[in-house]
Amino acid sequence: MTAKPEHYDVIRKPVITEKATMTSEANGVVFAVAMDATKPQIKEAVEAIFNVKVKAVNTTITKGKTKKFKGRPGVRSDRKKAYVTLEEGNTIDVSTGL
Protein backbone atom coordinates (compact mmCIF):
# COMPACT_ATOMS: atom_id res chain seq x y z
CA MET A 1 0.00 0.00 0.00
CA THR A 2 1.38 3.40 -0.94
CA ALA A 3 1.12 6.43 1.31
CA LYS A 4 -1.37 9.07 0.21
CA PRO A 5 -1.22 12.75 1.23
CA GLU A 6 -4.20 12.32 3.57
CA HIS A 7 -2.26 9.71 5.55
CA TYR A 8 0.17 12.43 6.58
CA ASP A 9 -2.77 14.55 7.80
CA VAL A 10 -3.80 11.75 10.17
CA ILE A 11 -0.38 11.10 11.73
CA ARG A 12 1.22 14.32 12.97
CA LYS A 13 4.44 13.19 14.70
CA PRO A 14 5.87 10.44 16.88
CA VAL A 15 5.69 10.95 20.63
CA ILE A 16 9.04 10.40 22.33
CA THR A 17 8.62 10.16 26.10
CA GLU A 18 9.65 7.70 28.78
CA LYS A 19 6.31 5.88 28.54
CA ALA A 20 6.51 5.76 24.73
CA THR A 21 10.00 4.28 24.94
CA MET A 22 8.75 1.57 27.30
CA THR A 23 5.92 0.87 24.84
CA SER A 24 8.46 0.36 22.05
CA GLU A 25 9.99 -2.49 24.04
CA ALA A 26 6.57 -4.24 23.81
CA ASN A 27 6.46 -3.81 20.00
CA GLY A 28 4.45 -0.58 20.10
CA VAL A 29 4.75 3.01 18.89
CA VAL A 30 3.03 6.22 20.02
CA PHE A 31 1.96 8.95 17.59
CA ALA A 32 0.30 12.34 17.97
CA VAL A 33 -2.68 12.22 15.61
CA ALA A 34 -5.40 14.54 14.34
CA MET A 35 -8.31 15.05 16.74
CA ASP A 36 -10.85 13.80 14.18
CA ALA A 37 -8.83 10.69 13.22
CA THR A 38 -10.49 7.32 13.81
CA LYS A 39 -8.80 4.04 14.71
CA PRO A 40 -9.28 2.53 11.21
CA GLN A 41 -7.81 5.68 9.63
CA ILE A 42 -4.81 5.55 11.99
CA LYS A 43 -4.24 1.87 11.22
CA GLU A 44 -4.42 2.46 7.46
CA ALA A 45 -2.04 5.44 7.66
CA VAL A 46 0.59 3.62 9.74
CA GLU A 47 0.47 0.56 7.47
CA ALA A 48 0.80 2.74 4.35
CA ILE A 49 3.55 5.06 5.57
CA PHE A 50 5.78 2.55 7.35
CA ASN A 51 4.95 -0.70 5.45
CA VAL A 52 4.18 -2.67 8.64
CA LYS A 53 1.24 -4.72 9.92
CA VAL A 54 -0.75 -3.18 12.79
CA LYS A 55 -2.21 -5.47 15.45
CA ALA A 56 -4.17 -2.91 17.50
CA VAL A 57 -4.74 0.83 17.92
CA ASN A 58 -5.66 2.48 21.22
CA THR A 59 -6.31 6.22 21.44
CA THR A 60 -6.43 8.75 24.24
CA ILE A 61 -7.50 12.40 24.32
CA THR A 62 -5.76 14.77 26.73
CA LYS A 63 -7.75 17.90 27.50
CA GLY A 64 -5.83 21.18 27.41
CA LYS A 65 -4.91 22.74 30.73
CA THR A 66 -5.97 26.21 31.81
CA LYS A 67 -2.84 28.32 32.21
CA LYS A 68 -2.12 32.02 32.65
CA PHE A 69 -0.55 33.91 29.77
CA LYS A 70 0.69 37.38 30.72
CA GLY A 71 -1.66 37.39 33.71
CA ARG A 72 -4.74 36.38 31.72
CA PRO A 73 -6.28 32.92 31.69
CA GLY A 74 -5.86 30.87 28.54
CA VAL A 75 -6.39 27.26 27.51
CA ARG A 76 -3.85 24.97 25.88
CA SER A 77 -4.96 22.85 22.93
CA ASP A 78 -6.43 19.36 23.35
CA ARG A 79 -4.23 16.49 22.14
CA LYS A 80 -4.95 13.02 20.81
CA LYS A 81 -2.39 10.20 20.98
CA ALA A 82 -2.52 6.80 19.33
CA TYR A 83 -0.82 3.79 20.90
CA VAL A 84 -0.15 1.47 17.95
CA THR A 85 0.74 -2.18 18.63
CA LEU A 86 2.57 -3.88 15.76
CA GLU A 87 2.45 -7.52 14.67
CA GLU A 88 5.43 -9.68 15.66
CA GLY A 89 8.47 -9.09 13.46
CA ASN A 90 7.50 -5.52 12.50
CA THR A 91 9.38 -2.50 13.83
CA ILE A 92 9.32 1.26 13.29
CA ASP A 93 12.35 3.45 13.94
CA VAL A 94 10.82 6.73 15.16
CA SER A 95 14.21 8.47 15.26
CA THR A 96 14.05 8.80 11.44
CA GLY A 97 11.81 11.48 9.95
CA LEU A 98 8.31 10.89 8.63
From Swiss-Prot:
Q: Where are the transmembrane segments?
A: none
InterPro entries assigned to the protein according to its UniProt record, in alphabetical order: Nucleotide-bd_a/b_plait_sf, Ribosomal_uL23-like, Ribosomal_uL23/eL15/eS24_sf
- Give the matching Pfam families: Ribosomal_L23
Q: Which SUPFAM superfamilies match?
A: Ribosomal proteins S24e, L23 and L15e
Entry keyword set: Ribonucleoprotein, Ribosomal protein, RNA-binding, rRNA-binding
Q: Name one GO cellular component term.
A: ribosome
Gene Ontology terms describing biological process: translation
UniProt family annotation:
Belongs to the universal ribosomal protein uL23 family.
Q: Which NCBIfam families match?
A: PRK05738.1-3, PRK05738.1-5, PRK05738.2-4
What is the role of this chain? One of the early assembly proteins it binds 23S rRNA. One of the proteins that surrounds the polypeptide exit tunnel on the outside of the ribosome. Forms the main docking site for trigger factor binding to the ribosome.
Protein name, UniProt field: Large ribosomal subunit protein uL23
